[in-house]
C-alpha cells in the first residue's frame, strides 16, 4: 500500500473539458489516481489505494509510485495548455514488481493567439519484475491562433525481468511540429510493444 494524500478537485472550464475529452480516450475523472497539469500548474490531484502521485521538489513534474498491489488499475496525468509559452515537465514512474496498470497521459493545446505554445514532456519509467504496464499518450492541438503548437515528448523506459510494457502514442491533429525521442532498456525476457499513429 502507498501513502495517500487528500484529493484536490476543481471546476474546469469548457475549453479544458473539451480538450480532455479528446486526449484522454479512457475518460478523465477527478477520482482515483489522477493529476491534471493546466498551463504549467497542477490544478487537481488524487491518489488511489495503490497509486501515489508526489510533486517533485527539484524539478517541475511529479513522481508516480505504483504498488505491487495495483491490479488492472488506471492513473490519468493529462496536460492542457490554453495559454502561450513553454512548459517543461519531468514525470517519473516507479512500478513495483507484479503491478498491472494503465497510464493515460498526453497533452492538448488550445491556441488563439499569435505566440508559440510548446510542451516538452520528459517521462521516465522504472518497471520492476513481472509487471504489466500500458502507457497511452495522445497529442492534440486546436484553436484559430497563428502561433505554433509544438509538442516534444521524451520517453525513457527501463523494463525489469519478465515484464511487459505496451506503448501506444497518437498524434491526433493540429500539431505544427513535434520531435519524439524514445529510449528503451529491456531486462531478461522483458517485452515491449509499440503502436504509433500520426494522424496530422
Language model: regions and residue ranges:
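Conserved beta-strand/loop scaffold segments within soluble protein domains that form the structured core
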Residues: 34-37, 44-200
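Short, Gly/Pro- and small/polar-rich lid/capping loops
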Residues: 1-57, 67
Amino acid at each position: 500500500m502507498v501513502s495517500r494524500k487528500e484529493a484536490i478537485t476543481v471546476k474546469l472550464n469548457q475549453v479544458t473539458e473539451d480538450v480532455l475529452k479528446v486526449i484522454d480516450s479512457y475518460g478523465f475523472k477527478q477520482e482515483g489516481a489522477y493529476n491534471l497539469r493546466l498551463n504549467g500548474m497542477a490544478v487537481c490531484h488524487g491518489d488511489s489505494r495503490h497509486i501515489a502521485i508526489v510533486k517533485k521538489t527539484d524539478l517541475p513534474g511529479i513522481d508516480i509510485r505504483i504498488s505491487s498491489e495495483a491490479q488492472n488499475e488506471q492513473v490519468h496525468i493529462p496536460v492542457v495548455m490554453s495559454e502561450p509559452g513553454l512548459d517543461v515537465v519531468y514525470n517519473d514512474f516507479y512500478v513495483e514488481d507484479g503491478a498491472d496498470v494503465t497510464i493515460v497521459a498526453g497533452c492538448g493545446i488550445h491556441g488563439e493567439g499569435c505566440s508559440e505554445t510548446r510542451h516538452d514532456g520528459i517521462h521516465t519509467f522504472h518497471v520492476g519484475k513481472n509487471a504489466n504496464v500500458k502507457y497511452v499518450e495522445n497529442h492534440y492541438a486546436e484553436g484559430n491562433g497563428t502561433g505554433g503548437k509544438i509538442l516534444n515528448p521524451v520517453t525513457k523506459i527501463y523494463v525489469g525481468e519478465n515484464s511487459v510494457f505496451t506503448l501506444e502514442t497518437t498524434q491526433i491533429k493540429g500539431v505544427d511540429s513535434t520531435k519524439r525521442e524514445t529510449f528503451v532498456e529491456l531486462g531478461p525476457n522483458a517485452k515491449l510493444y509499440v503502436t504509433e499513429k500520426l494522424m496530422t
